[in-house]
UniProtKB/Swiss-Prot annotation:
Part of the ABC transporter complex HmuTUV involved in hemin import. Responsible for energy coupling to the transport system. Its EC number is 7.6.2.-. This is Hemin import ATP-binding protein HmuV. The gene is hmuV. The keyword rRNA-binding does not apply. Residues 2-256 form the ABC transporter domain. Coiled coil: none annotated.
Length: 273
């Protein structure tokens, strides 16, 4: 399990997260929701290990405990951590004209022996990851020529390649996928396809997934659990049906909604009241 316990994060005098506790369970998708500036990306970066130790930005102070499979996150070296968790940030725009294939192969480098090169197996995994991300038609393209949605799917393939299961990976224990607004640049169909894939690999590969999603209806349909972030802490965490209530949404967003049952067994759809 990937767990934050009594987490506090401050940037100089600005408290961003306060006394926050949350666990990401293997095999399940947790959607993180909250208004702009609530601290969602900060929480994800903290879970990723990007705000502690030598990589901590100036002025950032983090207290509390974060453990990955029972081990303090700060004690895991960078290479092993890259084999245990993958991160898809909001803006992953390459500055150089790499090919789609090269970008996805970057996900395999934590698994390459020091001083070695990617293998035929790595290239096969990259191709399979592109297929699962519905990005295989983009192979050979210069990534600087891709649309925002095309690039998002390629970057999603990269993190799939990073966590692709093999014997060594499975022996290392549960692994984790951290996604910061993975659907933001995608059209309607690709939003649902990507989150369908996320849920499928969470179960197949025993991944714990934390995904920041802005659309509550999208989150409710695809996540196993939802965590609502407000005032620097988790104000509700549970199943979509339990969390996505008018009272919780009003508390989190200051916006009135009502719930409409769809009749297909899925959680109710949220509409303005």
């Amino acid at each position: 399990m990937l767990t934050a316990h009594h987490l506090d994060v401050a940037r100089r005098h600005n408290v961003i997260l306060r006394d926050l506790s949350l666990s990401i369970e293997p095999g399940r998708v947790t959607a993180l929701l909250g208004r702009n500036g609530a601290g969602k990306s900060t929480l994800l970066k903290t879970f990723a290990g990007e705000l502690t130790g030598s990589v901590a930005p100036n002025g950032v102070r983090v207290t509390g405990d974060i453990t990955l499979n029972g081990e303090p996150l700060a004690c895991i070296d960078a290479r092993r951590l890259a084999c245990l968790r993958a991160v898809l940030p909001q803006a992953a725009q390459p500055a150089f004209p790499f090919s789609v294939d090269e970008i996805v192969l970057l996900g395999r480098y934590p698994h390459v022996r020091r001083g070695g090169a990617t293998s035929h197996r790595d290239r096969d995994i990259a191709w399979q990851a592109l297929e699962r991300a519905d990005a295989d038609a983009l192979v050979g393209r210069d990534v600087t020529t891709l649309s925002g949605g095309e690039l998002a799917r390629v970057q999603f393939a990269r993190v799939l390649a990073q966590l692709w299961p093999d014997d060594d990976a499975m022996e290392a224990g549960p692994r984790y996928l951290l996604l910061d607004e993975p659907t933001a640049a995608l059209d309607l169909a690709h939003q649902h396809r990507l989150l369908d894939t996320v849920r499928a690999v969470a179960r197949e590969w025993r991944l714990g997934v934390l995904a920041i999603v802005h659309d509550p209806n999208l989150a409710a349909r695809h996540a196993d659990s939802i965590a609502l972030l407000a005032d620097g802490t988790i104000v509700a965490h549970g199943t979509p049906r339990d969390v996505m209530t008018p009272a919780h949404i009003a508390q989190c967003y200051g916006f009135a909604v009502k719930m409409v049952e769809t009749g297909d067994g899925a959680p109710p759809v949220m509409v303005p009241a």
